[in-house]
Design a protein with these regions (language model features):
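Polysaccharide-binding surfaces and accessory modules of carbohydrate-active proteins
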Residues: 1-126, 132, 142-144
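Generic detection of long, well-ordered alpha-helical segments
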Residues: 14-17, 33, 150, 165-169
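Short helix/loop capping segments that flank catalytic or ligand/cofactor-binding pockets
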Residues: 34-35, 123, 156-157, 164-165
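Short beta-strand and strand-turn-strand segments in soluble, beta-rich domains
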Residues: 135-139
Length: 171
């Protein structure tokens, strides 16, 4: 089906902190409501041989336990939270992508990202057979699709990004 929808991609840079924000605005230009089943704030495309993703998971009394894993070629890794407003306890919507090797404190190329959203989210990392990494982040509306009324506007939460060629300590 075809819907009268306009999607705007917004990017804002903050030179003083070397960060970027990216988000999307969805405009329903029709008269009827539509359901949004997924709404990504941002997507990235990278190319190198190996990718490692660091995430921060946990539970009460053991929050923000750091774990790092390689995204194998042809595979996808997803960080998902469907706990609503308990997201901060179960896992952070933040990540580190390390290129060509595990993340190091003071060397190596890394991208840090955090979705500025306290509710359900989905962050995914797909390593293609051709050595591209496609990554995206956004709120997860799968448990309850968002109804965007006719003439309505929906703004996704921003994904905050920064990059360093000198390890995660500099980023």
């Amino acid at each position: 089906p075809s819907y009268p929808v306009r999607v705007e991609i917004h990017v804002r840079s903050h030179r003083e902190s070397d960060t970027f924000l990216q988000w999307a605005v969805v405009r329903n230009e029709g008269k009827e409501g539509i359901r949004l089943h997924r709404a990504a704030s941002a997507q990235l495309g990278l190319r190198t041989e190996r990718y490692f993703v660091t995430s921060f998971r946990g539970t009460w009394g053991g929050e923000s336990l750091m774990s790092e894993e390689e995204v194998a070629r042809g595979h996808e890794l997803a960080l998902v939270s469907g706990t609503g407003t308990r997201t901060a306890q179960e896992g952070s919507p933040g990540f580190i992508i390390s290129l060509d090797g595990p993340a190091r404190e003071d060397s190596g190329e890394v991208i840090l990202g955090a979705l500025a959203w306290p509710g359900n989210y989905r962050i995914w990392f797909r390593h293609s057979p051709y050595h591209y990494l496609f990554a995206g982040a956004g709120l997860d509306t799968a448990p309850a699709p968002y109804l965007l009324d006719g003439g309505g506007v929906f703004e996704t939460p921003p994904l905050i990004l920064t990059h360093s060629k000198n390890g995660k300590g500099e980023a």
